[in-house]
Structures are given as C-alpha cells and as structure tokens.
Amino acid sequence: MSNFFAGLADVLTSEPAYIGAAAVAALLAFGACGEWIAERSGAINISVEAMMLAGAFGATMGYHLTERFTVGAVFGVGAGMLVGVCQAELSHRLTADQFVVGLSLNILILGLAGYLEDVIKPDTKRAATVDIPLLSDIPLIGEALFGQAWLFYLIYPLVPLCWWLVYRTGWGLEIRAVGGSPQSADVSGIDVNRRRRQSIYAVGATSGLGGAYLSLALVGSFEDDIVGGRGFIAMAAVVFGGWTLRGSIAGCVLFGTVLSFRLSLPVLGYEINNELLTALPAAAPIIGMAVFAHRVRAPAALAQPFIRGLR
C-alpha cells in the first residue's frame, strides 16, 4: 500500500501522467457530451460502447482508403451515427426495449468490427501532435492541454456547443421538455419520440468522433477490444455529474485520471498488484455514484418509453 501512495505522489508531479489523463478524459467526454443530451431527453442509450467501436473502425477504414485523417474522422462520425440510427429507430419508433437494443448492438458491433478487421486488415497510423505556441510551454499541464493531436482539440468547442444546443435553442428546450414530462410535451405539439431519436443521433455523432480520436490519435491502429469499456464509463460520468454538462465533464476528468493512473504507475517503475490496478477504473465510477447519487435528480422520464395515449 505504501508503494501505491508513493506512486500516486510521483504521478501527480509527472507531466506524462497529465498528458495521459487529459487524453483519456477527452475520449470519455466525446461520449459523455452526446449521452448527456440523450438522457436529458429521457432516452437511455447503453450502446455508447458500440458507437465508439464503430467510430474507431470507421475512422481506421477512412484513413486506410484515403490516407487522410480528416476523412477518417468523418467516416468515424458516420459509423457512430449509423449505430445511433439503429438504436433510435428500434427503441423510439418500433418501441423495442432500450436496454435490450443497446446490449444487442454492443455485442453485434464487437463481433462485426472484429470480423471485418480480420478480413480487411486496415492500415493506419497515429496522427502527429500539434503544439499550440506558448500555451504548450506551461509547466506540467501545457503539453496535456495544448500539445495533443488535432482531434483532441475538437472537444474544446464541442462541450460549449452541446450546452448551447440544450439551453439556448428551441430544440434544446423541447429536448428538456420531453425528458421532464413527455405527456405534457406531446399535448403542446412536440413529437416526443422524434426528439429522442434526434438526441440519440447526437450520441452517435459525438461517440463516433470519440472512436475516431481513439484509433487515429491515441492508438494509431484498430483492435476489436480497443474501446475497453470506456463507453460505459462515459455513461457513468453523466450519472456521476447529476445529468449536468459541467458535472459530466468533471466526471470524465476524474475517471480519465484514474484510468491514466493505472497505466502511469508501472511506467514510473512501481510494482503494484495488477488486479488492483485493473479494478481501479471500474471502482472509481461505482464509488463516485454511490457517494453523490443522493444529491442529484435524474430527468423525470429517464428510460421511460413514450407511446401516445398511454400513461
């Protein structure tokens, strides 16, 4: 245990640890931004994992075909949205169970992406980092926040864009209305299921972009287990943050730091029990939600399907 805390002290003063924490936090934030919008609409989408995996594979294929990272990113967003369309149409048009659909998509995309990767064997490489002058020279955190691959920087405009959409547009007002009282929203003329479908399309887009960031910027290749449960951790960040965007991003930073901490300790030469390190990323969301769950309120209609005429 003394090794653990000594390692923690070293990690907190290690610039590479901050770089890793920021990179993983950004990955989680890509998924959490869209998931936050969906859950504010009352939709529960557990296929974030599948969307990220599809985005990672789509981005790899896009780069494989064109050797352009921008095209890869577009392919990633498209692949993530395709999974989002499946989730949205099955759950909020055909009224299939949201949890069953999400779980099925996670399993389907995992198998499909693995099969296609074995058959096609797409070739890619890791995008170069782009240092922002002066800002990247800030001690300890400069490289972490301003010395990453260009895909990383997309999270900076994405977060305020999502906030603006939900709180400063008529569409966002309707999203919040259908998440709070879908019956009242329906009476006022809002198409509840249409708004929920649109919110899930948004999750597909942001999670697909996150998958592209993972395969093109963080890893530089594709494997069928590349996401490794981070889609579920992004969902946990939304709950941890009390269904607020600010809280969700804070959760992403916390969980991303824990995930990075697991990888940083061995690199710094500390021999920590491998099972303990493996459990850390899963334990952090559970502990966080247990501590803060009583302080937050979920959208009133979260996970409740809407069928016109039924209460």
Please tell me what each predicted stretch does.
Residues 13-18, 166, 203-236, 267-272:
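Inter-helical junctions in multi-pass inner-membrane proteins, predominant
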Residues 110-141, 262-270, 294-303:
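Extracellular/periplasmic helix-loop junction at the C-terminal end of a transmembrane helix
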Residues 98-100, 125-131, 148-153, 196, ...:
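Loop-to-transmembrane alpha-helix initiation sites
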Residues 16-69, 73, 78, 82-99, ...:
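Single transmembrane alpha-helix segments in multi-pass membrane proteins
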